[in-house]
Amino acid sequence: MLIDRFGRPVTNLRISLTKECNLNCFYCHREGQLDGERTMKPEEIERIVRIASRLGIKKVKLTGGEPTIRKDIVEIIRRIRPYVVDLSLTTNGTTLYTLAEELKEAGLDRVNISLDTLDRKKYKMITGFDVLDQVIKGIEKATKLFYPVKLNMVVMRGINDDEIWDLIRFAGKVNAILQLIEIEVPREMENSQFFKDFFYPLKPLEEEFEKIAVEIRERRMHRRRKYFLPVDGKVVEVEVVRSMHNTVFCMNCTRLRLTADGYLKTCLLRRDDLIDILGPLRNGASDAELVDIFKRAVLMRRPYWT
């Protein structure tokens, strides 16, 4: 197993398959990626995952952009499935209604689906497209095939903070987990108008949840808290992702990232942490040399918030 200088094991690899997306959410951080021209081929992704698996990284999440707009998404899942124990995908849900069965058959375990609002006008304002009904159909299909299904709600002040309980009820209705996510930005953007306008702190909400939850659990990843809330005769699982200035969050991060253009990246918010792995792979690097690149990346890891 890979362990960084701060004693944090690295067990998860988050792979961006593309920087492109069929929506245009105004807040999207695009996994912290800069513009690049290279695109990893399925066999290249497979080899990198195989190396990662040898090093104890057994959980992989596929992201984007929107990963399902890649025509070879099913092939990619099928290729990397043998090397991992948990294979998940983060999606905006627009293609799920038609793709869900193929993704499941290829070996996908579970999905996270972005859903910031249940209001069609707001959805179009946030994403640029009027496709909420299509996404809801995809969510309903996914909950029949995958477990668990997580709905990702980025909470934004003045936009959807009034819908938190509506989303909790909806998650209960479709038997999904709701993840409430704070907007996160690097230090240099904390004084930006964007952050001032839209950041909605979730700590007060967690305090409210603590009073009414029938059960509270803590995940190993980031020490995120999961609240089991009684709503409309059901118990709904709500997970809170609160990263800004959260030192506990950073000290319990077990992730390494792989950008769509083939760089290992140690932290979403850093801009100085890219290590090229696709270039050496294409230039004939041996497995041992690729292992060394992973080890170098892990040695570069350090908590962002300290």
From Swiss-Prot:
It is an enzyme of class 4 (lyase). Its cofactor is [4Fe-4S] cluster. GTP binds at R14, K61, T90, K150, R255, L256, R257. Belongs to the radical SAM superfamily. MoaA family. [4Fe-4S] cluster 1 binds at C21, C25, C28. It catalyses: GTP + AH2 + S-adenosyl-L-methionine = (8S)-3',8-cyclo-7,8-dihydroguanosine 5'-triphosphate + 5'-deoxyadenosine + L-methionine + A + H(+). Catalyzes the cyclization of GTP to (8S)-3',8-cyclo-7,8-dihydroguanosine 5'-triphosphate. Binds 2 [4Fe-4S] clusters. Binds 1 [4Fe-4S] cluster coordinated with 3 cysteines and an exchangeable S-adenosyl-L-methionine and 1 [4Fe-4S] cluster coordinated with 3 cysteines and the GTP-derived substrate. It comes from the Archaea. NCBIfam families: moaA_archaeal (TIGR02668), PRK00164.2-1 (NF001199). Keywords: 4Fe-4S, GTP-binding, Iron, Iron-sulfur, Lyase, Metal-binding, Molybdenum cofactor biosynthesis, Nucleotide-binding, S-adenosyl-L-methionine. S-adenosyl-L-methionine binds at Y27, G65, S114, M189. This is Probable GTP 3',8-cyclase. Pathway: Cofactor biosynthesis; molybdopterin biosynthesis. Residues 5-232 form the Radical SAM core domain. The gene is moaA. InterPro entries: Aldolase_TIM, Elp3/MiaA/NifB-like_rSAM, MoaA_arc, MoaA_NifB_PqqE_Fe-S-bd_CS, MoaA_twitch, MoCo_biosynth_MoaA/MoaC, rSAM. GO terms for molecular function: 4 iron, 4 sulfur cluster binding; cyclic pyranopterin monophosphate synthase activity; GTP 3',8'-cyclase activity; GTP binding; metal ion binding; S-adenosyl-L-methionine binding. PROSITE patterns: MOAA_NIFB_PQQE, RADICAL_SAM. [4Fe-4S] cluster 2 binds at C250, C253, C267. Its EC number is 4.1.99.22. GO terms for biological process: Mo-molybdopterin cofactor biosynthetic process.
